[in-house]
Amino acid sequence: MKIFHIVSNKEWGGGEQYVYDLSQRQRADGIDVGIFCKPVETIVQKYAETGMDVLPLALGGALDLKSAWQMARVIRNLRIRESEDQSVILHAHNFKDAFTACYARSLAGRKQVRVVMCRHLTRKGKNSWLYRWLYRHLDRLIFDSELSKSEFLSTHPAIDASKLGVVHTSIVVPKEVTPVDIRTRFGIPSDCVIGMYHGRLDPEKGLDTLLDAVALLQDPSFLKDTSHLSPLTSHLLILVGRGSDEYTAHLKQVAADKGISDKVVFAGFVHPVLPYVAAADFGILASTVQEGCPLSPQEYMSQGHPVVVTNNGGQREYVIQEQNGLLVPPGDAQALAGAMARLIDDAPLRQRLGQQAKADFDDHLDYAHYYAQIKTVYGV
């Protein structure tokens, strides 16, 4: 089998890392993997250093026939036999690249070529004549959550339901993760409970609501109303990640205005992030938008930590209320603060939820489980 992943973003991000992890796992299985990507030096270099064939193309979308011709030429030049085990898979990760892949297959005239696409966004399906053509020519369309699939189907796109599937995305976890000593690094006392968010610093991640929640945790009247003793156990929020200079400055100003600057640490971008995740006591995802299968909750779960997440995205398909985490409505600072207060004040609850989170991740969320499912997508 020969697999080509098609990657058309202009900078390295989560999608590129997803393809990197998947391609390396496929190569470990003895599969020949190549990458079609834009001629962006950092992206080309990152993939090429693994030893994979990297083929730069413009990848301009549905009307870019030149890239389709170039891709078709590569396919025609492959030495493949007319047998099932010599199938060629064009694996697209968005619709515009799926168009290019379908054009290339037609131009190459190779019947062994299959086009599959993994949908990593939660969007309504389009139903124009152009997309109806694409749906007919795709072999499989895989969503990262039931939510994403349901949202896509809400507009009744004309696609054969047998082509659709759901595979929850996962993360690659090293065999050993050594926690960073963030307490020493940031001068955090040993008895302080650490809540952590990691990811982009962006308004859609609900970070303003999160800061509102931290402010409520300092309010004796709120704690009294929620049956918590005042003051709470010593606690701190660490924000790991970066965003625009403007929005980062906004968050710091909000923290200052609310008098919680001493309760919030801006750690900036770190890589790898799992050693930081491992050093936290619980994780937080306060996203106000519907994310298909956000990975940050899985990262905390993999390290045996409970999570507080909003209930509006695909995370509710694997974070189960009161079993491995706590769910709250998006944009609800009081509900978020209440859930955080429970984890801050109740160490046995953190331990119970964290143990189940780890068990659930190992049982049905880890990368081995994901990879076993994704292999079936290729249909060979």
Regions from the PLM with identified roles:
Residues 1-230, 234-380:
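Membrane-interface segments of envelope glycosyltransferases acting on lipid-linked substrates or membrane lipids
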